[in-house]
Structures are given as structure tokens and as C-alpha cells.
Regions:
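Concave beta-strand-loop units of leucine-rich repeat
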Residues: 3-95, 99-118, 122-141, 145-206
Length: 206
């Protein structure tokens, strides 16, 4: 597979599962004081005036993208399996995501640019995920939070330290459906090991 084909597949997945339309963006609002239609399917926020984002009443929401909401410590999702895509970027004080384990049908998730959740154990319950990105998360823990039976096809570890763990390659090797891996910067020794242990995975550095 060529580099362009790799990028095209990545782009198609993001377009399918996450919204990035500036026309639908809510900027620096107190979201909990808003009254969106109950059948809202897409929520795109940039910034937040509240330290809690409560989406629990939107039981038809499918896509949530939150960027730069640095005040937010807690996100509350609906107690119903409805969210198919969750994107969280530049939220350095986020501590918890309530009800996320209800959303077993989730297909896309990214935690990018300094999201400092204390752990990612909830991902073990989300076995239908296809795409998972941790771009620029320097303190990412070991990968025991990803279940071997996961349907994950695409993993992104650009600008992380994940390959400093001796266990990383064995965890990746256990993911039978993994096909695309963005490693970020790695040493020649690490690249050789990855190619040897993951011969069926298409890889790029970034």
C-alpha cells in the first residue's frame, strides 16, 4: 500500500465517523444551559464555560467532537448505546467520562493532544471500535486496556512514548484485526521489530 492510499483510508474513516464542520461548531458556550433538539445527532464543541459537559439527555446523539475545553473535568454520556464516534482533543483537565461503557457500538474514538484521563480501562468494553487515536499523549499507559478480541483496524500513536514499553509489540500482535498502524517516530530497531512481528499491518511514522 502506498503512503497516499494509507492517508486516503485514514481520511475516509474520519469523514465517516466524526464531524468536522465549522458551521456546526458551538464556541465557548455553557453547554448545560443550552436546549438542543432531543433528536440531536451531532454535537461539535470548541471550548466550554463549564467544568462538566452533560450530554445524558441526548439519547440519539451519534457523533461528539470536543476541542480545547480545558476547564472540563467530567463528561456525561447518555445511558444508552447511541454514540458511534467520540473525539476529544486538548482537554488537559479531563478526569472521567461517565456512562461510556454503555456505548458498546462505538466505532471511532480519538484522545489527542494532552488528554490526561487517569486510565483508559473502559476501552476494554468497546470491542466494536475500528479507529483509535492517541496523538500527542505523552503519558499513555501500557496497552492492556485494549482487549485482544477488539475489532480495531486502525491505531494512531503519533508523538507518544508507547514504544518505550517492552510489552507494546506483544499487545499489538494480539490484535488480530489490526491492519493500519501510525507509529510516530521510532528507532530502526523498533521498526525492524514491528515489521517482523506485524507482517500483515500497514505502517507509517506519521
Amino acid at each position: 500500500m502506498t503512503y497516499k492510499e494509507f492517508i486516503d483510508i485514514n481520511r475516509l474513516l474520519r469523514q465517516k465517523y466524526i464531524v468536522e464542520n465549522p458551521e456546526e461548531m458551538l464556541k465557548d458556550v455553557d453547554f448545560n444551559q443550552l436546549s438542543l433538539p432531543s433528536n440531536t445527532r451531532v454535537i461539535y464543541l470548541m471550548g466550554s464555560k463549564s467544568d462538566v459537559l452533560d450530554f445524558s439527555k441526548y439519547e440519539q446523539v451519534e457523533k461528539i467532537l470536543i476541542v480545547g475545553a480545558r476547564k472540563v473535568r467530567k463528561i456525561i454520556l447518555p445511558q444508552k448505546d447511541c454514540v458511534k464516534a467520540l473525539g476529544i482533543s486538548s482537554m488537559t483537565n479531563l478526569e472521567t467520562i461517565e456512562n461510556i461503557s454503555f456505548h458498546k457500538g462505538m466505532r471511532y474514538m480519538h484522545f489527542d493532544y494532552g488528554v490526561k484521563l487517569p486510565n483508559f480501562s473502559f476501552i476494554r468494553d468497546l470491542n466494536q471500535l475500528l479507529y483509535l487515536s492517541f496523538t500527542a499523549n505523552k503519558k499513555l499507559p501500557e496497552l492492556d486496556f485494549i482487549h485482544p478480541s477488539s475489532e480495531l483496524r486502525f491505531l494512531d500513536f503519533v508523538d507518544t512514548s508507547i514504544f518505550n514499553y517492552a510489552t507494546t509489540v506483544s499487545y499489538l500482535k494480539s490484535l488480530k484485526h489490526l491492519r493500519f498502524l501510525t507509529t510516530g517516530r521510532t528507532s530502526q530497531k523498533q521498526r525492524d521489530l514491528l515489521r517482523s512481528e506485524l507482517p500483515h499491518v500497514c505502517m507509517r511514522e506519521g
